[in-house]
Amino acid sequence: MYIKHRKLIATHTPLQLKFHEAMKIHGGRLPWEQLPTTAQAIPAIYKIAQTLISRAKEIYPHLPSIHFDFINSPKINGIACKSNGEYFIGITGGSVTLLQLMVHRMLADPTLFTDIGDPAKEESELPYIKKFVPDAMDLFKTGTKVSMPKNKVRLSYSCNLINWAAIFLVGHEIAHITCGHVDYMASNIGTPYIAELNWSATNAIKPMERQAMEGEADQFSFAGLLAIAFEKSGANSKTSNHAQINDLYRRVFEYSFSANLLFRLLGDERFVG
């Protein structure tokens, strides 16, 4: 999801303009309100992101404001930064598009996730993604299209996996703020942001130091997803029944699968070259 040659419109709120300025070097704000209904994942991710930020504020009540929105870039990336005393978190529209491309293609295949919905409704022979590059615009130029699941249950399940992968990335960026990583980079390196890919400050810190920050952010993000899984399954009660436990197992699988796919998109040579 990317809007080329985007112009700021008068209806942008002051907060949206703040986000745009903070993320300008990364692409600025994606005006997702202008996108077609096919971008339905965006509002859902935005809503859950606000919930995660609210939870972070409950745990760290003295934490300055954190603002989340989407970045107008076709590439996959997540960024946490600090600007004028406020924190900003953004994930690129390209991240959502690439997740849709991969996950929808899986659920559109009748031989995958056969226990979800009615696989017989799906096409038996789908075109393969012949050459994957981590840039939605480049894929679009080569004629690559998103294959959508035809069965409604499978489509809904696919959308959930996409949402959770994106939310894991949001939680990861929140952790970069709450764990002090962004402040550390600002005070020690002079770079007030952390980007998952194409980060200019990568060589400014030791690889082990960067790895430790990323590992800590992953830990906090997944812990947040597990907390949501317990809440939604009802398995956090001493009287949890078999169905609730099974539901918890399923949710943990979904979150783990989604996070793993995101890791692949961010760093597997088979995806990013």
Regions from the language model: what does each represent?
Residues 174, 186, 190, 201-205, ...:
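A structural signal for the main folded, soluble domain(s) of proteins
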Residues 217:
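Histidine- and acidic-residue-rich, metal-dependent catalytic cores
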Residues 154-166, 203-213, 240-256:
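Glycine-rich, flexible loop segments associated with nucleotide phosphate handling
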Residues 210, 223-273:
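Long, well-structured alpha-helical subdomains associated
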Residues 166, 173-189, 223-229:
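Catalytic Zn2+-binding segment of zinc metalloproteases
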Residues 179-214:
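Post-HEXXH active-site segment of zinc metalloproteases
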Residues 1-164, 179:
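Hydrophobic or amphipathic, alpha-helical segments that drive membrane association/targeting
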